[in-house]
Each structure stands twice: as C-alpha cells, then as structure tokens.
Amino acid sequence: MAGHSKWANIKHRKASQDAKRGKIFTKLIREITVAAKNGALPEDNPRLRAVIDKALTVNMKKDTIEKAIQRGAGGGDDSNFDELTYEGYGPGGVAVYVEVMTDNRNRTVAEVRHAFSKHGGNLGTDGSVAYLFSKTGVILFAPDVDEDAVMEAALEAGAQDVIANDDGSVEVQTSAEDFMAVKDALMAAGLTPESADVSMVPATMAPLDVENGEKVMKLIEMLEDLDDVQNVYSNADIPDEVLESMGG
C-alpha cells in the first residue's frame, strides 16, 4: 500500500501548494459554479455540498461561496463551463488523467497538449488510460488519528477499504456513491479528516527512477498550474528522494 500513501501525499502536498498560490480558490469557485447549475441547495445537491466542504476547509469566505452558487444557479453566460477529461502518458510510460472545466475547448486542449509535449509525454485518445483508474471516495486522516476508531466507524458506514499508510496516516476508501454518507458518519464519530474528495485512484502503481520521477512531477505541476485544470491523477510511483527535493 506504499503507492497509495505516496499518491495521497502528492495530492495533499499539491493542495497545500495551490492554496499558497491562490489557485485553488479560482478552481473551487469554478467547481461550485458548475455544481450549482444542478441546484442551489447543498442538502439536495451532494456534489455542491462536497465542494462547499472543500472550500470551507481552505478557509474560503462564505460570501464568496454564496456568490459562486448564485452565479451557477442563475445560469448566466459566465457559468457556462464544459467538463472534460484528457488522457495521456508521461515519462516512463505512466498514465496521466486530467479533469478540466473550460469555456474554451480549443485553448484548453492546446495548453494541455503543450504541457505533455514539454515534459516528455504525449496526449492520448479518450479511453487510453481511464481504465487504469476507478472513481473512488478517498478520506485521509493525519498520522495521529485513532486508527481503530476510524476503521470501526468507516466499515460500519459502508466503506470499501481502510488503509494504514507507511507514514502513519489512515486512508478510507469508499464508492463514489457512498462517499458523503461515510464522511458524515466519520465526522459524527468525532473523526475529522485532513482531506476528503472523490478521486480517480489507480489500480496499480508504475515505479519510476529518479530522472523520470522528476520529469513526471514537473509535468503534473505544469498541468495543475493551468487555470482550466481541476485535477490531475497519475499512477506514478515517485521515488521518495524526488518528493523530498520538490517539497513533498
């Protein structure tokens, strides 16, 4: 399960770095706007509720959240974003899966293709790597959590798996459909996660040497820096020394 630990760490590290740059706010506002098109009430719109929770976790003001909801629910031109995915291969043959929200498909595909090309990868066709991932709820707890308490509450609530990571953190995995119910049950048990999201989890990891590990990290960071990109997932098993040298 070491690969899962590294994968979770990469996602968490990037979330922290994005917050410092302010980019995560822009991405979350866009996600709230899109989610609100299916209903402005979080209690009736699980997707909206999930992204509001993420926004509150990074200390977004409620006024900012409310404005994004109103913009999406109002259906104006400034809320017309297409949700797309791009798939490709990075250095060492690793699979890369990119989720975007865009108001200009031509601009976005050009930027994504450029990022792959610049860092030794190539953009593939639809379906080329998606089969290597599964849509999974991932609820991550810090290393000081009571592992037994998490396991008991999670399994009772219908979680698929509870993983004790090498770094001491505990990862709860759920089906996408059960994600909010399991998260709510854990919160009700007094267990507050470090992060919680529905993600694309790789079935197996692809080990990399240091050189390719550095290239893949640069590719992922360039993709995540693009305004239209919401999430980047990879099955890359990055060497520890690369993670440490890049602030992991």
Curated annotation (Swiss-Prot):
GO cellular component, one term: cytosol
Family to which the UniProt record says this protein belongs: Belongs to the TACO1 family.
One MF annotation (Gene Ontology) recorded for this entry: DNA binding
SUPFAM superfamilies: YebC-like
UniProtKB keywords: Cytoplasm, DNA-binding, Transcription, Transcription regulation
Subcellular location: Cytoplasm
Organism name: Hahella chejuensis (strain KCTC 2396)
Protein name: Probable transcriptional regulatory protein HCH_04926
Principal place of residence: cytoplasm
InterPro entries, A to Z: Integrase-like_N, TACO1_YebC-like_2nd/3rd_dom, TACO1_YebC_N, Transcrip_reg_TACO1-like, Transcrip_reg_TACO1-like_dom3, YebC-like
One Gene Ontology term from the biological process aspect of the record: regulation of DNA-templated transcription
Pfam hit, one: TACO1_YebC_N
Keyword Nucleus: no
